[in-house]
Amino acid sequence: MIKLGVIADDFTGATDIASFLVNNGLPTVQLNGVPPSDFKVDTQAVVISLKSRSCSAEQAVADSLNALAWLQQQGCQQFYFKYCSTFDSTAKGNIGPVTDALLEQLGETQTIISPALPVNGRTVYQGHLFVMDQLLSESGMRHHPVTPMTDSNLMRVMEQQAAGQCGLVPYAVMDQGADAVKQRLAQLKEQGMRYVVLDTLNEQHLLTQGEALRDMKLVTGGSGLAIGLARQWADSTKQTSSATEAGKPQSGAGVVLSGSCSVMTNKQVAHYLKQAAGRAIDVARCLESDDAQQSYAQELADWVKAHRDDALAPLLYATSSPDELAQIQQRWGAEASSHAVEKLFAAVARQLQEDGFQRFIIAGGETSSIVVQTLGIHAFHIGPSISPGVPWVRSTTHPLSLALKSGNFGDEDFFARAQKEFAA
């Protein structure tokens, strides 16, 4: 029976939380999209990855309720709405509406908001989200092309886009342990607080949350909360090693595809270009006629194939600085340019798969999503972590291994380390 069912709002976020579940003792399978009603899976945790982070609230709600219905059919005991640790959601965002819809469908009146991931520098203090030593609103996320985060107060952000009031469990209460947190949640529930932000400064706070929230029907947050919940649900750690083993990367030709324009991905691309062959994507050529786009995709695939025997996999990147990105969006439009680049990456990936490439390292949630769909991968095993929240994964049905990285995750040497430390 599935103990924990996770509804993740993007592909890289799904692999992020799946890796934390596996590494903390809970065997996990990730599903790419909602499977048919008769699809069965034998595991203790399931992560359903959607592509709802940047879409309209209406579409995100519909997709999330569809995922919830499948998990309910499987007899799932606890539900987890997973979003980014930087709470990617503006005043018109969909985290609030999705949370409201899930609460209503489950007949619940309260849930928690816990995006923190201290190991990656995401902490919550007095209800405000920090990235390292900066308020979220003063970090690189304020320049995000789709969800610019200009307010660090999670209670205020939540109330702007959701239907209820939002309270807080401050760090002083969190320090007192699970019983104190439960008591505070009960008090806030009596006061009509539909959502409760949880201060989180360290991993012990995540463990406390896991213990306190074991019986809450719906929880919401980033991947950090999974650390505590997995340890509450896990029977033992014996199954963890076998689950990780199933996801280890296999040998074969590889490629790095980078569609993210985050601060860290810019650093990673610049660092990798000093070690490996790289080629920048020409956005203008992505927006030409269909025949021209096909020709460009073939040209790029041929370039990658020419480097298939290199010591490090070749890199194709659309990664650009905030200034360059602003110019691109001003000239061609944010949505049009983003869609065109994703379509190109998908076409290149398809050609490389047909030519026997079996290892794909991908930076960016949207890029990861469309490439995984194009490669025909519906489910995969979670393998060893390259960086916190970024594991290697292996298709359950195809000879394909992938590393799907959220924009700001990983260190500067991520692309090379993913290959060197996990050589098959």
UniProtKB/Swiss-Prot annotation:
Catalytic activity: 3-dehydro-L-erythronate + ATP = 3-dehydro-4-O-phospho-L-erythronate + ADP + H(+); 3-dehydro-D-erythronate + ATP = 3-dehydro-4-O-phospho-D-erythronate + ADP + H(+)
Signal peptide range in chain numbering: none
SUPFAM superfamilies xref list: YgbK-like
One matching Pfam family: NBD_C
InterPro entries in alphabetical order: 4-carb_acid_sugar_kinase_N, 4-carb_acid_sugar_kinase_N_sf, NBD_C, NBD_C_sf, OtnK
Gene3D superfamilies: Four-carbon acid sugar kinase, nucleotide binding domain (3.40.980.20), Putative sugar-binding, N-terminal domain (3.40.50.10840)
Taxonomic superkingdom: Bacteria
Top EC group: transferase
EC number of the protein: 2.7.1.217
Gene Ontology terms for molecular function: ATP binding; kinase activity
Chain sites annotated for binding ATP: S260, G364, G365, E366, T367, G407
Transmembrane segments: none
Protein family (similarity comment): Belongs to the four-carbon acid sugar kinase family.
Functional description taken from the UniProt entry: Catalyzes the ATP-dependent phosphorylation of 3-oxo-tetronate to 3-oxo-tetronate 4-phosphate.
NCBIfam families in alphabetical order: OxoTetrKin (NF043035)
Protein name listed in UniProt: 3-oxo-tetronate kinase
Native source organism of the sequence: Pectobacterium atrosepticum (strain SCRI 1043 / ATCC BAA-672) (Erwinia carotovora subsp. atroseptica)
Name of the coding gene: otnK
